[in-house]
């Protein structure tokens, strides 16, 4: 059964076997419960299924889903014909995630993983190289953003290697990269509230931090909090490290006049 990549699903199939193996090596699956996002032609699936305790693969493309079922009739893989963004997970188990994810919904997938961090151990993902650079960006750089801080709040992010566009069929217009997120067992603050705070301070990147915060907190409290973390009133969100952002959040939440 010949399968043609569908643009609407953002499909680019990784055809380099050495890189396929390298991705699985980075994932380091060892008798664990695995979720695969977009198995596609099943290249990574074939390698992972021998290493996993349980493997659930979400494939939105009905044609690929049928092909995968035929080729994996006697395996331990459970294929689900569903958009990963609509998926629900068994919260009684700990999962590791792997996938060459559709680049047009990368942020949505990352935030779904963030929301489910408590049942996740690790994620190994193929993303655009530009996105990978954003995820590991340092403060005071143009790549540093809401996404950077949000993902790093729930886990340790590492960029492993770049995958050139020529290793895919069809070849995308940009290079890709492999990243991992090792999720923290617990978080120091409420996830929903912290994500809302991060969104607020990065709402208008050109605005000073104080102007993004004053709608919710009194100006005097904001000025005092910014000074407490060693910054000036003119500071912008992209100048703060994750640790400084969390300290600022803690001070403001505990401020007497809030």
Curated annotation (Swiss-Prot):
Subcellular location, record wording: Cytoplasm
Binding site for S-adenosyl-L-methionine: 12, 14, 38, 59, 83, 100
GO molecular function: 16S rRNA (adenine(1518)-N(6)/adenine(1519)-N(6))-dimethyltransferase activity; RNA binding
SMART domains linked to this entry: rADc
Predominant localisation class: cytoplasm
InterPro entries given in the database record: KsgA/Erm, rRNA_Ade_diMease-like_C, rRNA_Ade_Mease_Trfase_CS, rRNA_Ade_methylase_Trfase_N, rRNA_adenine_dimethylase, SAM-dependent_MTases_sf
Reactions performed catalytically: adenosine(1518)/adenosine(1519) in 16S rRNA + 4 S-adenosyl-L-methionine = N(6)-dimethyladenosine(1518)/N(6)-dimethyladenosine(1519) in 16S rRNA + 4 S-adenosyl-L-homocysteine + 4 H(+)
SUPFAM superfamilies: S-adenosyl-L-methionine-dependent methyltransferases
Pfam families from the UniProt entry: RrnaAD
Function text: Specifically dimethylates two adjacent adenosines (A1518 and A1519) in the loop of a conserved hairpin near the 3'-end of 16S rRNA in the 30S particle. May play a critical role in biogenesis of 30S subunits.
Family: Belongs to the class I-like SAM-binding methyltransferase superfamily. rRNA adenine N(6)-methyltransferase family. RsmA subfamily.
Protein name: Ribosomal RNA small subunit methyltransferase A
Gene name for this UniProt entry: rsmA
